[in-house]
């Protein structure tokens, strides 16, 4: 089985209990190295094959998934936050569907929730706001050289 797992918004202890279990059971883990906390890889068993997808193409990632599936391996595709929210997993799921390879999604704590917690903010307030709209800026935004407080404000 291939499972897309949400790693949470950064801190190692913000991955879900289910996500932890899937990492511990995985034979193969493909993680978004530029985004996922590498400390989470400590959960993997000793013989787990670990791939950093930061420099892999979609085709290379799929090749690892397809081969692993053919070998009967448990595969985790580890994405930051919640993979179903800006996780860029649609193209991977589409290809797996074409190949009739089963997969599932394990939700994670999204960065917008982590940002609210860090800022001690509440998104909805009775009589003030009952909705949350999630959107993002067009194009790529590098947050590497931005201070942590500013980064949290941008994320929220």
What are these regions (language model features)?
Residues 1-109, 114:
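Class I S-adenosyl-L-methionine
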Residues 9, 110-111, 138-141, 151:
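Short acidic/polar capping segments at secondary-structure boundaries
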Residues 14-16, 140-143, 147:
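Glycine-rich, anion-gripping cofactor-binding loops and their flanking helix/strand elements
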Residues 18-20, 66, 120-124, 147:
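A generic local secondary-structure boundary/capping motif
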Residues 111-123:
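Structured adenosyl-cofactor binding patch, chiefly the S-adenosyl-L-methionine
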Residues 122-143:
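Internal, active-site/partner-interface "lid" segment
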Residues 144-156:
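Single conserved hydrophobic/aromatic residue that forms the stacking wall/gate
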